Curated annotation (Swiss-Prot):
GO biological processes: signal transduction
GO molecular function, one term: GTPase activity
Family per similarity comment: Belongs to the small GTPase superfamily. Ras family.
Top-level taxon of origin: Eukaryota
Name the UniProt record assigns to this protein: Protein ras-2
Residues recorded with modification Cysteine methyl ester: 226
Encoding gene, per UniProt annotation: ras-2
An example Gene Ontology CC term for this record: plasma membrane
Binding site for GTP: 15-22, 62-66, 140-143
Length: 229
């Protein structure tokens, strides 16, 4: 299923604290639901997947949502290719902050539109200014129907305003979890086919389908097949 080389896609998960960014990421990569809220600073995962019949490697960066990590977030955005913007349908305040995260993505990507902008960074992280940044807006916790504060229609309207894709998802029931990430990959793949971005390739890894290859100070989560290096 996997050839001699795998194409790498670097995705970054952004959103307010407590909206379920970690739960979505772990559900995607390890197929496990994390019940407890354990604030993240920066966790990275890799998972080998097949999307539309093509094998690839996803590198997913789960990030902190707190305001004090704004400077770090610039670097995370700079290194990312596609983004999953998450709010909770049961939290109006997390929905209201989405525009702030989206603005930060646009600001950072505009400043890194040429490799010379940041000599210390990889030129592959630079963006083509003519190509839109692939973003998926995700209304998480769709299983919490009785606690809903943000309607599906509001989610669609915001996505149209921001010019990005939208879905509601539930990390708990795994509803639309793959869609949230895979649709970003499909956007990136289309851009690469059109010559708007440069593919990243990496040599074949071991037999592990999923890896957590860097962690924070709070690594005590069930990991399933996860390999820590």
């Amino acid at each position: 299923m996997v050839g001699n080389k795998q194409v790498l896609y670097k995705l970054v998960v952004l959103g307010d604290g407590g909206v379920g960014k970690t739960a979505l990421t772990i559900q995607l990569c390890l197929e496990h639901f994390v019940e407890t809220y354990d604030p993240t600073i920066e966790d990275s995962y890799r998972k080998q997947v097949v999307i539309d019949g093509q094998a690839c490697m996803l590198e997913v960066l789960d990030t902190a949502g707190q305001e004090e990590y704004t400077a770090l977030r610039d670097q995370w955005i700079r290194d990312g290719e596609g983004f999953v913007l998450v709010y909770s349908i049961s939290s109006r305040s997390s929905f209201a902050r989405i525009k702030k995260f989206h603005h930060q993505i646009q600001r950072v990507k505009e400043s890194t539109s040429s490799p010379s902008a940041y000599p210390g960074s990889s030129p592959l992280a630079a963006t083509n200014p003519s190509a839109p940044v692939p973003i998926m807006l995700v209304g998480n916790k769709s299983d919490r129907v009785t606690e809903r504060e943000v309607s599906t229609q509001e989610g669609h309207a915001l996505a149209r305003e921001l010019g990005c894709e939208f879905t509601e998802a539930s990390a708990k029931t795994r509803t639309n979890v793959e869609k949230a990430f895979y649709d970003v990959v499909k956007q990136l793949r289309k851009q690469r086919q059109q010559g708007q971005s440069t593919p990243r390739a990496l040599p074949p890894s071991g037999n592990s389908k999923s890896e957590k290859y860097s962690g924070t100070e709070k690594p005590k989560r069930p990991r399933g097949k996860c390999l820590i290096i």
